[in-house]
Amino acid sequence: MDLHEYPRPANDTGIGVHWTVGFASTIGMGKIRDFWIPELKAMGVKWVKIFNHDGAIDFAELLLAEGLMPVVRIYRPSPYPSAFDLRDVVHIDALIRAGVRYFEFNPEPDQDTEWKGGRVPANAIELAVENIITNLDTILERGGMPAIPAVSNGSRWDLVGKIVARGRKDIFNGPVWHAIHNYSRNRPLDYPYDIGNQEGASYTLRFYQTLADETWGEDAWRGRALHEINKLRLERCNPGATIMDDNACWLAYEFMDARNRRHLGRSIPILSTECGYLVGEDGDARYPATTPDLHMAQTLE
């Protein structure tokens, strides 16, 4: 299926939000219609990911009527190893009748929390791919557009490659897309190509002090002095590094696209179903923890 054949909202901005994981019906369709829909439109949002909880069909119909594209996750706690049950299929059918096309299911199969028993087994990727193929076929047969499940941020799991290796490259002739969770961590948006990672460029005193003075209840530098930060940046720089070396960042979609093209000979659509900056995140010590001001600036960027 060619890219232009995938349905998109009118005047698509590419901007989306992940709705609360709770029940849409908790606050009521009236408040969503009167308050939240105008807020979404004011921000330029065109895509809204929701869960298939009670009220999801009404919510999806409202989004479609307002020119927004719903992406529905079929929620199943600790779903692996298993495929959709009858209840899931009935709900998928109802959502498709309501106009929903994009479906997501069972993300991050590389994480313990997604497996019954709470642990990823040794042959997890093989078991997961078996279930994923079954679910993809189920949604495709009903006229839906399923996602290859997202793996966790920075994971090297190659689900597309495994599906192709099982002789099911034909699945990608249909309207399949790829979900990703390209969380930025506390790294800049152009990581790994930023000057800090490539050359170990030093922070200025002005930048350091601006973040140090921000009042938010935590220390952006985690007690490290400027000279300590700059020493760390120089020692841990990675000249020539590309996204293929480290994809735990915003640009993870470039990594996924390169692998997909290698396996399929072409790109397939990639939609980020979880991403962004998290206040307080500090996984890479070469960069400041994400403060509220940094969160705002980098999100707007």
What are these regions, as identified by a protein language model?
Residues 2-12, 16-18, 72-128:
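Ligand-binding grooves and catalytic loops that recognize ribose/phosphate and carbohydrate rings
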Residues 51, 106, 181:
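Conserved residues at the C-terminal ends of beta-strands
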Residues 1-54:
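Boundary/entry segment of secreted carbohydrate-active catalytic domains
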